[in-house]
């Protein structure tokens, strides 16, 4: 979810740290296991604390083999998951699917490969391309984040030059302290990319479990993979769906709208998001779709009046897009969620405008 090389991340470090520390965003203190069906489990990882967010992991145990969706961020967490899987079954993990290239979903690949040497790691072709570019540099990017946080403490100002409040300073200092164990671990990480890529939907039979691997369209990234279990009516969505606040800091929101529509049309009673608790209907998926569509429709209306985006700036259009009507449904009255929502929607408008500029 937290895209460590996104230009927007460094600009939003203070709010990101505040949110990652917020109990109202991620209340679980340890990984939480939910059984979704017979021999199908979701592991919802701690998403805050040390600032290294880990996506959800889904485990599908067949009569012959095990299929894992997303290997999470820190290898130590992946090893804990592997130990849990071995409590459930003595069958080997034969497949790990990385839903997309953000490293909170795939930096644990090496831990799985070490534990199961015959493992096949699957990703969409576009995902592997991005993994190979960005995966090996994880430690360096996190060092830059630490340096940015330290600079804020030293200067007493955020990256926009605004003075830090006493609360902000405490949050940043605590974040640096929490991040140290993860930074130490990243020094020894060996990046493991996908070993098998796909461009078209395919099915794997694990033995009494049919696993369909799908590409429903671009959204969060260029290669978002979705896993569908038709017998159990379960969809594993990756970061196409993130709760409680969508992760829309880059990606392809104009296409994401249709991708979410495609996802909602799968016959599913359970949806596993990339981050957050399991869902049992498509209500939240459609809410995210509607948010993006509202932003795009308002932007298009402004462009129809003002002219093509290539001749405008974001400042020319952002005041014409009002997404406050969605705020209550995403954030309620929680101040941290409201701050996250406002940052997300500002970036949604920015990315939509950038897409429009290329038309």
Annotated model-derived regions:
Residues 35, 174, 187-192, 197-229:
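Core dinuclear metal-dependent hydrolase active-site scaffold
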């Amino acid at each position: 979810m937290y895209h460590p090389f996104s230009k927007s991340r460094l600009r939003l470090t203070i709010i990101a740290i505040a949110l990652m520390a917020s109990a109202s965003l991620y209340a679980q203190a340890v990984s939480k296991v939910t059984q979704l069906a017979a021999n199908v489990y979701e592991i919802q990882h701690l998403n805050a604390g040390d600032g290294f967010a880990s996506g959800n992991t889904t485990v599908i145990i067949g009569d012959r083999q095990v299929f894992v969706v997303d290997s999470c961020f820190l290898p130590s967490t992946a090893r804990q998951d592997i130990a849990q899987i071995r409590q459930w079954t003595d069958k080997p993990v034969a497949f790990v699917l990385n839903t997309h290239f953000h490293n909170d979903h795939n930096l644990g690949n090496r831990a799985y490969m070490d534990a199961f040497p015959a493992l096949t790691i699957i990703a969409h072709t576009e995902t592997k391309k991005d993994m190979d570019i960005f995966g090996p540099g994880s430690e360096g990017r996190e060092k830059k984040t630490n340096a940015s946080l330290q600079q804020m403490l030293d200067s007493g100002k955020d990256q926009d030059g605004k003075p830090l409040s006493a609360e902000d300073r405490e949050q940043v200092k605590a974040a640096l302290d929490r991040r140290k164990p993860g930074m130490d671990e990243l020094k020894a990480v060996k990046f493991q990319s996908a070993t098998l890529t796909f461009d078209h939907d395919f099915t794997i039979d694990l033995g009494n479990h049919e696993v369909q691997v799908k590409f429903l369209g671009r959204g969060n990234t260029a290669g978002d993979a979705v896993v569908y279990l038709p017998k159990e009516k379960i969809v594993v969505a990756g970061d196409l769906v993130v709760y409680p606040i969508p992760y829309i800091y880059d990606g392809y929101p104009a296409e994401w709208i249709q991708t979410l529509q495609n996802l909602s049309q799968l016959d599913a009673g359970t949806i596993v998001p990339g981050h957050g608790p399991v869902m049992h209907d498509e209500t939240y998926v459609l809410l995210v779709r509607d948010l993006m569509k509202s932003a795009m429709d308002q932007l298009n209306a402004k462009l129809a009046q003002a002219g093509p985006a290539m001749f405008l700036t974001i400042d020319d259009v952002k005041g014409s897009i009002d997404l406050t009507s969605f705020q209550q449904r995403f954030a309620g009255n929680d101040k941290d969620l409201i701050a996250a929502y406002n940052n997300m929607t500002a970036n949604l408008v920015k990315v939509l405008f950038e897409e429009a500029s290329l038309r």
